[in-house]
């Protein structure tokens, strides 16, 4: 197994190097071409400047977060040719028209398979308008209904969720769907892989999706062949190619498992050793997961099938994947799985978090590996705190990306000055993404408090209301606060001019990180 891991790393380093080198050559060649043309032709120089100005005006007029516009406008004005090229590569979602239409067609095909749960929304409204409004937004703006008749268990430790997941996989009778940002063909996945192989031999349909960038360095290029040789259908989302690719900035960050359309898992952990503290690259790794059983799993099934067919359209009849559920839940309360798509204009992940803050009356607690947020999100945090809500955010004590960590800390001062309390997870790196408010509502999923998750990636989460698991999330936060170091006062103090300027620059370009 160790030799396989070394081979995977070596293979991935080679792929990354060759791909980056070829893309760099293309970009440098284009820039050099324009520079030379500008040098020898005043007309071309004027044309390139005019194009840069038009692009800046177009960016300014786009219906997007203002914090996303500013760094692009500055970059293009400072370096017209290179700036426009980088923007078209990484920042211009409009170039993905074909991909956007493909996803829209799939959504039109699959959305009718989601049930109309207006009666449940009305029931929630009669019981508690505060949580009903949150559920109403997800249902009517994102298109994912809220369900009752669903049992949900929260796992504050990723390893517990992983073990429960393996036990559930052993019970599969018809199909298994799995979609993950990162898979590492190492110790943690070995046990799960043997279960999947055995299930495939039994005739269970097994499908697996992983993101190419997320899994790079973790698996060999022959991983798909290995899976398919054992009867497992395997697809790679958004393969990295050595050519300028305008879609490569959008990654599949989701974590979904569906078993027979009745049992589902999601949360923060990927299928790699570091998530279960088998390895410790950044101290103790904090992550989480949820297990759901019942009606709400239907939404996870739709999410997976959308991504599966987005990679390659093969399904024409979805009937077999939506069996009639005869399960009767033991718990009361409501569950609402939902997804976020960077190709539409509805920033569901960000809006759900802001709704949690805007509706909170007593407290709102968040944990995130990165804190790179828009002015709108920052305002939601500070307004809640100024209303007297106990607002707290937990970030890592040991970072996985030092530059991003510096950018994360650059947001502390403005938040703590308005009453938000900041805690750093002393034992290591917190990869969990969860929030809870007022003992009524909680969200657990894949969505970080950063621009990549909120604007660029395909994400998913589960909101749940008036469930026992809400108390479980709250208890997890209470335990985490004991393990954390509060840095509120430290970052409330006066900062030097040099530090303030540096942090302003970090925040300015945070949307590009």
What is each of the regions a protein language model found here?
Residues 1-351, 355, 359, 399, ...:
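N-terminal localization/anchoring segments of enzymes in phospholipid and broader phosphate metabolism
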Residues 340, 367-368, 395, 425, ...:
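Thr-Gly-centered strand-to-loop micro-motif
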Residues 370-391, 396, 401:
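Helical hairpin unit composed of two closely spaced alpha helices linked by a short loop
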Residues 376-378, 405-407, 437, 455:
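Histidine/acidic-residue-rich catalytic or RNA/ligand-binding cores of hydrolases
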Residues 380-384, 410, 478-479:
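Short, solvent-exposed amphipathic alpha-helical segments in soluble enzyme
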Residues 433:
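Catalytic-core elements of nucleic-acid end-processing and repair enzymes
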């Amino acid at each position: 197994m160790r030799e396989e891991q070394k081979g995977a790393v070596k293979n991935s380093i080679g792929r990354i190097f060759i791909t980056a080198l070829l893309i760099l050559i293309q970009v440098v060649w284009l820039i050099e071409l324009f520079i030379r043309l500008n040098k020898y032709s005043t007309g071309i120089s004027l044309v390139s400047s005019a194009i840069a100005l038009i692009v800046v005006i177009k960016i300014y007029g786009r219906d997007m977060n203002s914090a996303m516009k500013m760094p692009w406008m500055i970059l293009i004005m400072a370096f017209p040719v290179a700036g426009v090229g980088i923007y078209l590569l990484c920042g211009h979602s409009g170039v993905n028209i074909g991909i956007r239409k493909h996803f829209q067609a799939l959504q039109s095909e699959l959305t009718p398979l989601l049930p109309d749960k207006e009666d449940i929304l009305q029931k929630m409204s009669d019981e508690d308008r505060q949580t009903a409004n949150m559920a109403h937004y997800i249902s009517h703006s994102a298109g994912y209904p809220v369900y009752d008749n669903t049992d949900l268990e929260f796992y504050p430790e990723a390893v517990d969720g992983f073990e429960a997941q393996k036990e559930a996989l052993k019970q599969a009778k018809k199909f298994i769907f799995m979609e993950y940002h990162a898979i590492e063909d190492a110790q943690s996945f070995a046990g799960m892989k043997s279960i999947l192989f055995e299930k495939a031999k039994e005739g269970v349909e097994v499908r697996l999706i992983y993101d190419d960038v997320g899994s790079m360095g973790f698996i060999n290029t022959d991983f798909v062949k290995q899976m398919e040789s054992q009867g497992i259908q395997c697809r790679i989302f958004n393969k990295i190619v050595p050519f300028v690719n305008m879609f490569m900035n959008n990654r599949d960050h989701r974590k979904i498992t569906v078993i027979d359309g009745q049992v589902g898992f999601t949360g923060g952990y990927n299928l790699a050793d570091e998530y279960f503290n088998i390895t410790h690259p950044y101290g103790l790794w904090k992550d989480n997961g949820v297990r759901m059983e019942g009606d709400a799993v239907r939404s996870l099934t739709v999410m997976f099938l959308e991504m599966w067919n987005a990679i390659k359209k093969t399904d024409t009849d979805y009937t077999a994947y939506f069996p009639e559920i005869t399960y009767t839940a033991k718990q009361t309360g409501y569950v609402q799985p939902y997804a976020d798509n960077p190709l539409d204009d509805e920033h569901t992940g960000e809006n759900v978090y802001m709704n949690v803050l805007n509706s909170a009356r007593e407290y709102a607690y968040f944990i995130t590996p990165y804190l790179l947020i828009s002015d709108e999100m920052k305002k939601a945090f500070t307004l809640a705190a100024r209303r007297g809500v106990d607002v707290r955010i937990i970030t890592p004590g040991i970072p996985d990306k030092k530059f991003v960590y510096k950018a994360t800390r650059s947001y502390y001062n403005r938040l703590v000055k308005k009453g938000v309390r900041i805690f750093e997870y002393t034992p290591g790196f917190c990869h969990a993404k969860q929030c809870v408010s007022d003992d009524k509502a909680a969200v657990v999923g894949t969505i970080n408090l950063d621009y990549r998750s909120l604007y660029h990636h395909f994400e998913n989460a589960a909101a749940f209301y008036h469930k026992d698991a809400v108390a479980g999330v709250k208890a997890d936060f209470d335990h985490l606060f004991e393990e954390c170091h509060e840095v509120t006062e430290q970052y409330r103090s006066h900062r030097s001019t040099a530090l303030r300027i540096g942090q302003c620059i970090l925040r300015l370009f945070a949307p590009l990180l």
